[in-house]
Amino acid sequence: MQDTPPAAALDAQAPWLAPLRPLLPLLAQADWPAALSREAARRDVRTAAGLPVRFVPPQDAGATAYEAHIAATGRVPTRAGGAGALHDAGNALMWLTLPRSKAALNARQAAELARAGVAATRGAVRDAAT
């Protein structure tokens, strides 16, 4: 059974979605992560280190911490279906809408991971950046 694209879970007319409305049709595509990757390429969305941002399957990160993986590769693990798809779609929309903010937050997270390592909980710095 194929998962429903995240657009089906959204009320596109909700006022809080107004800034994102131009991007919502991309979430209706069967391979919406690829559609958002193409849009990221078109907009030249980059990490703080200048790497192009792309939305990839979660297994792409392997055992690497999520934010560290993004900072090192520009590849954002994105669940295309299931319970996490809507959350990851929202994250991708933020990368497309607020790319410099997302890049700065990701860089801060990655720096904290490099400093403190991965622990059972995020810690104050990473919680604030999340």
Where on the chain are the PLM-derived regions?
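The feature captures two recurrent sequence modes
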Residues: 1-75
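Aromatic- and glycine-enriched beta-alpha-beta binding-site module
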Residues: 65-130
